[in-house]
Amino acid sequence: MSVGVIIEHHVRPGSREQVHAIWDQLLRPAIEANLGHEAYSYMYDVEDADVIRAFQQYTDAEAASRFLSTDAYAAYVVAVENLLVGPPTVTRTDIIWSKARELPQP
């Protein structure tokens, strides 16, 4: 069964673009190469400029655990920790149904 992970970062005021640049450098290539990811969305909160959320859909719970223990994820956590207000909120879910389609890249 596919599982989802929702991560919410509260960044220090004005740090959102810097956190995104670090994510783009360290995590995006790892996510693109990871066969365990079925879908991934990196999102900015519309009402709060200091909140970033990510939705990750994995093939199963083991794939999620494996990715969250990779060197790339560990490097990202270290690189952004001083830009965050505190640790991220992580919510794990069982995905009952989803629809995904390829979106054009910016």
How would you name each of these model-derived features?
Residues 2, 39-50, 75-106:
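Glycine-rich beta-strand-turn "strand-cap" elements at beta-sheet edges
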Residues 3-10, 39-68, 94:
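Short, well-ordered beta-strand segments in beta-rich or mixed alpha/beta enzyme
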Residues 6, 18, 79:
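Amphipathic alpha-helical recognition patches that constitute DNA-binding helices
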Residues 10-20:
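Short, surface-exposed ligand-recognition loops at beta-strand->loop->(often short) alpha-helix junctions
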Residues 15-17, 62, 98:
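Residue-level signal for secondary-structure boundary sites
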Residues 25-39, 57-91:
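An amphipathic, aromatic/His-enriched active-site/gating alpha helix that lines ligand/cofactor pockets
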